[in-house]
Amino acid sequence: MGEFLSMSIPERGYLLSPVLPVQDIGILYAPRGIGKTFAALSIAVAVASGGAVFNWRAPMPKRTLYVDGEMPATSMQNRLSALVNGMSIPPHTLKNMALITPDLQPCPMPDLSTAGGQAMIEPFLKDVDMVVLDNIATLCRTGKENESQSWQTMQAWLLELRRRGMTVLLIHHAGKSGDQRGTSARKDIMDTVSVCAGPGNTA
């Protein structure tokens, strides 16, 4: 214990200050139609470009991988284009951001709740600082959503990505109660839990 306490361990710092630390596992959830993907893309663009969003600022550009599980490629292109223009970000600063979206893949999107699906994503993780997974429902398809056991393989992978120095932001749907949909065990390893609320709703 004395050896551990005397170790020089660097502070984590932030990818997006003051809300998104380096080496963090976070979840952002909201009801359908509130703007989860818009918020997630805004965060990813800010981190990749070293820009700012929602009064949060990225100290420096970081390599970002955005994995989209459901959006048509044309819709994603339109959203990203509008977002980049609206944030006044020069397109060349987005060289740090990579995108995987279903329409442009030669096969179905991998199931990240399986070891095989995780292995398919691995080649894209080299030198990546942040991974955004949008969303749990479409990218984690094995098992029952309400059973904690079905989350164990995904949980182990997320912890491994964090051990390797990555920040992971998961996007998810809210259930009828307003909490994140499915097993509460998902929150057990989350460092950051955020919810998007509609206008006039501060929940």
What residues fall within each predicted segment?
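Phosphate-binding/switch region of NTP-binding enzymes
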Residues: 27-28, 33, 38, 130, ...
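Hydrophobic positions on the alpha1 helix immediately C-terminal to the Walker A/P-loop
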Residues: 39, 43
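Surface-exposed alpha-helical segments enriched in charged/polar residues
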Residues: 45, 49, 81, 122-126, ...
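Pre-Walker A (Motif I) flank of P-loop NTPase domains
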Residues: 22-26, 62
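Conserved RecA-like P-loop NTPase ATPase core
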Residues: 20, 44, 66, 134, ...
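Post-Walker A helix-loop "phosphate-sensing" segment adjacent to the P-loop in P-loop NTPases
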Residues: 46-61
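N-terminal pre-Walker A segment at the start of P-loop NTPase domains
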Residues: 1-15
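Conserved inter-motif catalytic segment of the P-loop NTP-binding fold
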Residues: 10, 16, 32, 59-145
